[in-house]
Amino acid sequence: MGDVVATIKVMPESPDVDLEALKKEIQERIPEGTELHKIDEEPIAFGLVALNVMVVVGDAEGGTEAAEESLSGIEGVSNIEVTDVRRLM
C-alpha cells in the first residue's frame, strides 16, 4: 500500500475568522495516521481567505475521511472540500 497527498480546502465562515488560530486548530486536529504537509492561504473574495491543507494519508479506501471529519468539526469552518489527490512515488 502506498501513500497519497490530498489537498483539502477549508473555507472559514467569514473574513473575521482568525486565520492563525484556525491554522493552529487544524494542526492540533490532524488525526492519527495522517501527516500534515503544509497549509497555504488562498484569497477568495471580499477579504475571505481559504486554507489549502495538504495532508499525506494511506491510499486505502476512505483515506481522507478521518481528516475531513476532523476539520469540518472546527468552530469557524463553513465547509471543506477535497480538491486534489495524488499518489506519492
From Swiss-Prot:
Xref: InterPro entries: eEF-1beta-like_sf, EF1B_bsu/dsu_GNE, Transl_elong_EF1B/ribsomal_bS6, Transl_elong_EF1B_B_arc
Domain of life: Archaea
Keyword tags: Calcium, Elongation factor, Protein biosynthesis
SUPFAM superfamilies tied to this protein: eEF-1beta-like
One GO molecular-function entry: translation elongation factor activity
Disulfide bonds: none
SMART domains associated with the record: EF1_GNE (SM00888)
Its job: Promotes the exchange of GDP for GTP in EF-1-alpha/GDP, thus allowing the regeneration of EF-1-alpha/GTP that could then be used to form the ternary complex EF-1-alpha/GTP/AAtRNA.
Note from the entry: Binds calcium.
NCBIfam families registered for this protein in UniProt: aEF-1_beta, PRK00435.1
Homology family: Belongs to the EF-1-beta/EF-1-delta family.
Protein name stated in the entry: Elongation factor 1-beta
Gene coding for it: ef1b
